[in-house]
């Protein structure tokens, strides 16, 4: 058993408690290396007094979808600036940040992995053969697009390893675009106001993905990260949006032009 290492720490010293518990776990594994043991120490507060690293801790800045439960987890830490701001930021800002995050996670329920589970979280092939064929063709098209866009930057990558995240980005963005369109329509916005709203949304969407990255890190990311590089997380979904291409006058043959296929809607 692991002794109660936080017994002498103040109750409000959350960092001290976490650090002590982390050290205890590390030392426990070292002591038991090569041995068979059933008690696995863990690192997170729970109602049972134990600790476990499960990604749902409120201090985790993340959100994720669980296909076996068909739900999304949104830890409290992401519900603050810069991910959401109800006081000083615009509707378009919040939609492009936390709204896009929600849309992305919702969309994982019907990506290339999530689609294999039914609404109860059971692995079950509930698809009709024809629907499955069409879906798989869309998966192949996403892989083709991301690999092509990367090749223009001299990057060779296997986009099939990250296609689930790519599909969630594409579908999540389309959910936001559809919602923004309905929102502005319900406000009675004229076309010029609508266009400005979309321009603002697209600008914030690109802004939140800004990144400076070393070439060595690029090579590491494309081999280990299930997410595409952020440049392609931005450009590839946008290149599929008819509204984006119309607003910015993007034509066939431009590098930011792909077919108007956002997985679950096809405007062509």
Regions found by a protein language model. Name each.
Residues 1-100, 105-268:
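Intrinsically disordered, low-complexity linker/terminal regions across diverse proteins
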């Amino acid at each position: 058993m692991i002794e109660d290492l936080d017994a002498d720490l103040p109750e409000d010293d959350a960092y001290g408690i976490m650090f002590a518990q982390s050290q205890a776990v590390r030392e426990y594994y070292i002591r038991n290396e090569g041995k068979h043991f059933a008690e696995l120490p863990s690192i997170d507060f729970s109602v049972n007094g134990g600790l476990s690293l499960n990604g749902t801790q409120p201090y985790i800045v993340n959100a994720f979808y669980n296909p076996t439960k068909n739900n999304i987890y949104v830890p409290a830490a992401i519900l603050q600036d810069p991910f959401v701001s109800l006081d000083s930021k615009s509707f378009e800002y919040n939609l492009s940040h936390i709204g896009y995050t929600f849309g992305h996670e919702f969309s994982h329920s019907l990506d290339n992995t999530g689609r294999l589970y039914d609404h109860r979280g059971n692995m079950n092939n509930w698809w009709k053969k024809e629907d499955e064929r069409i879906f798989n063709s869309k998966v192949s098209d996403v892989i083709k697009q991301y690999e092509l866009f990367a090749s223009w930057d001299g990057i060779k990558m296997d986009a099939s390893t990250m296609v689930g995240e790519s599909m969630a980005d594409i579908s999540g963005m389309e959910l936001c675009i559809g919602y923004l369109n309905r929102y502005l329509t319900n406000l009675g916005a004229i076309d010029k106001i609508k266009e400005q709203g979309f321009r603002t949304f697209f600008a914030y969407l690109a802004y939140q993905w800004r990144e400076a990255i070393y070439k060595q890190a690029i090579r590491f990311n494309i081999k280990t990260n299930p997410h595409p590089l952020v440049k392609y997380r931005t450009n590839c979904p946008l290149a599929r949006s008819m509204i984006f291409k119309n607003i910015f006058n993007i034509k066939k043959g431009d590098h930011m032009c792909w077919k108007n296929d956002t997985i679950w809607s096809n405007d062509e």
